[in-house]
Amino acid sequence: MRKKSQQIKIKIITILSVILMAGYVHAIGFGDIAGGLLGGGGSDLSGSQDTLTASLNKTLTDLTTSQKIMFQALKKDKQVQLCDKVLEGLKSEDFGTKDSIDKVMESSSKLTEAQAEQIAKKEILDAESKVLFVTSIPFYIKGVMGAISTGKQAVEAGQSIASLNPMALLKIGALISIVSKTPDLLSQLSGTTSSLFEFMAANDIDSTEMKQKIKF
């Protein structure tokens, strides 16, 4: 299950290494050489940045919505409140800047960690909580599928980023942030999904659709 997400992570790490090298070369005063070796800044990635930002927003909205419902079913009020804060951040007009993406991704990561910790306990839900928990599954499926799609787009965008000169990189901070953080998101979701299958089995919740649609 983790093979594809690991391949995406390796590709992105390789791309980021090239980006870091470009920045270092420029910093020590060989910007012109870097431009010649690593390509010019003519390739406009603003469109890719907008597309990936929108994709990430939809992905995190679906994931956070599913997590909120799961935490409600598990009666974890503190985590429910954090979900609300993340959802507010995703709706903010400021979402799309590097700082806003970094902040939301960090909060989302903490939520996923908390989610993994809770479902690993395999708590048996009462009837009412079970009904509520089941309503989170469609959002979770959409969120994970969106994360996988975003990861693939991030690899493609990263390959284009690697050909830019350092000055051009300054214009796409949000895109670089998404490209760099997506592998960790996928890695987290891969492990959480495996635990979620076990939780659902313990609570006699059908996971057939999840297993059919979620392919890491």
Where are the regions a protein language model picked out?
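Immediate post-signal-peptide N-terminus of mature secreted/exported proteins
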Residues: 28-101, 213-216
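Extended amphipathic alpha-helical interaction segments
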Residues: 101-216
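N-terminal signal peptide c-region/cleavage motif recognized by signal peptidases
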Residues: 22-25
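Bacterial N-terminal signal peptides that target proteins for export
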Residues: 2-13
